[in-house]
């Protein structure tokens, strides 16, 4: 009997300690943005900064968008052979694109997926709006039946990204990762038809 009381007291004490210390925190599950970015990284499409950080919460710029999508718009091996041509395509038309983005901007503008503002301006540091990103992806997918104002609705309708990730004035890098993976999945689906 004495042994039973000791065990009961020990269990009661352990239960009390467990209740006071709280539940063990489970590892946080990756967000949809992190999952999409990890996929793009594994496919060599998304790269981080010099420290490997992706800055998924930061607004995407037009130059970053061009760098992100140029490898899917045109075969990277072809671009490697024609780097000088795509650089000239950019520098002939735009006077504000940094060197690191010139080839990608040249690819995107030559393929008609992106355009500048006129007067030699591309606006490489300008934030990408959700409408702009959806417009680029819908052009890439050669979709019709939409306008710039309805591009986000069309992208959501096609399942490229949830409508909630296509809101606001500027698109975060993580939300672009979702849109890009959705577009790649949609393209793969179209190729099965």
Regions found by a protein language model. Name each.
Residues 108:
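Histidine- and acidic-residue-rich, metal-dependent catalytic cores
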Residues 2-36, 42-43, 47-66, 70-103, ...:
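Feature responds to low-complexity, polar/acidic, surface-exposed segments characteristic
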């Amino acid at each position: 009997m004495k042994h039973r009381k000791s065990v009961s007291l020990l269990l009661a004490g352990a239960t009390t300690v467990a209740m006071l210390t709280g539940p063990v925190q489970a590892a946080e599950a990756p967000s949809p943005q992190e999952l999409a970015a990890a996929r793009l990284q594994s496919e060599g499409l998304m790269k981080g900064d010099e420290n490997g950080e992706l800055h998924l919460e930061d607004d995407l710029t037009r130059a970053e968008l061009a760098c992100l999508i140029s490898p899917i718009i045109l075969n990277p091996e072809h671009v490697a052979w024609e780097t000088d041509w795509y650089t000239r395509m950019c520098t002939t038309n735009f006077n504000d694109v940094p060197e690191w983005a010139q080839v990608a901007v040249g690819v995107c503008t030559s393929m008609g997926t992106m355009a500048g503002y006129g007067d030699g301006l591309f606006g490489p540091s300008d934030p990408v709006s959700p409408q702009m990103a959806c417009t680029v992806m819908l052009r890439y997918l050669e979709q019709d039946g939409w306008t710039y104002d309805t591009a986000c609705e069309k992208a959501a309708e096609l399942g490229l990204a949830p409508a909630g990730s296509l809101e606001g004035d500027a698109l975060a890098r993580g939300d672009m990762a979702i849109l890009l993976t959705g577009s790649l999945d949609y393209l793969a689906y179209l190729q099965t038809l």
